[in-house]
Amino acid sequence: MAAWSNTRALGLSRVPRQTPRARLRLLSRAGEGAPVPLFLPLVLALAAGIEALDVAEFLRNPTKLAKGLQALHQALRADGITCGCGASLEMEALGAELDWKVYPPRVVAPPPALLSLDPANIAERVSRAARIVAAVDATRRLAATAPGEPALVVALTGPGSLSAQMARAIGSEPAIPLSPTAPLLEIAGRTVLEVARLFLLAGANVVILLERDRPAAEIAISETWASVVTPISNLARFHKALPIMLTTPDATPLPPAIVPCYPAAAIPEDGGRRPRALALGVDQLDWRLPKAEAAVLTTDGELPVDTDISALRVACQAVEAELDRMTATGK
């Protein structure tokens, strides 16, 4: 573990902070950041071990899901609880067949009649998807019962990345191009919008779009991408939630409502005042607080399901100790 500063070594006691949801309300105001960054690591399937369940079964059981996530949150003491996190969630909701021998599960067959789906079809499929139904139910329970007002986080596959998944899944058909197209982007965007809507109605406070396949600005479909992302960010803002996009800095400009999130190792020199999120790597737990200012600290994906919880707890405590130091010293 890195030699992090900690409150005891500095002669500091644990410093009271506003609740995570109160700090989120500050962030939701245009251009206003919270005094101390929110720490929101993406941890979901790891809680299956607490409930001694297979991951696939755990993610479909709302009672076990809510209980396991609350227990994991109490162990890690981060600022948020991850209620949903990618892992082909959206593809499965549309009807894709997944291989659950591994986690995250792999898509082995595309959703039926994918290219003929309209908004009503998409909304219906999403509303009946077992994993989404369980996660939304768990979100609703945690919103009502989790002590300390933790932020409730849902991390969804971004429209660009989801359309790329769709293209790969149907790429074995000769008539279908392997690269994402405008129609696929529109289907992907509507799918993410409908999934986000359900979580927001249940009480989610943060929507993170995992968007590694964001189209470059000069690509023709970049306008389509912007047109499907904007409603998602606007919906989050309508529900007083914070929309964040984990992506790379060198692609299509983001809608103004979205908080950009970049890997901590590749921070752009944008010089702007816009609140920014930074992502710590999940491939190792030797986390070091970035020198750049950030409104939110998260991770660049979901923590692996085989992560040692004790080691993760130590890593989270180190981050929280550094945030305590920042609170105490005003730095």
Locations of regions flagged by a protein language model:
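N-terminal amphipathic alpha-helix/helix-capping segment at the start of soluble metabolic enzymes
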Residues: 4-46, 136-148, 183
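Active-site-proximal, glycine-rich beta->alpha crossover segments in alpha/beta enzymes
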Residues: 3-9, 99-198
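Short, well-ordered coil/turn segments that N-cap beta-strands
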Residues: 33-37, 77-80, 147-152, 203-205, ...
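Aromatic-anchored, glycine/proline-accented short structural segments
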Residues: 192-247
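Glycine-rich, proline-tolerant flexible connector loops at the mouths of alpha/beta enzymes
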Residues: 80-102, 119-128, 204-223, 301
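Generic structural signal for well-ordered alpha-helices
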Residues: 21-24, 66-70, 136-143, 196, ...
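Catalytic domains of carbohydrate-active enzymes, especially glycoside hydrolases
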Residues: 67-86, 194-206
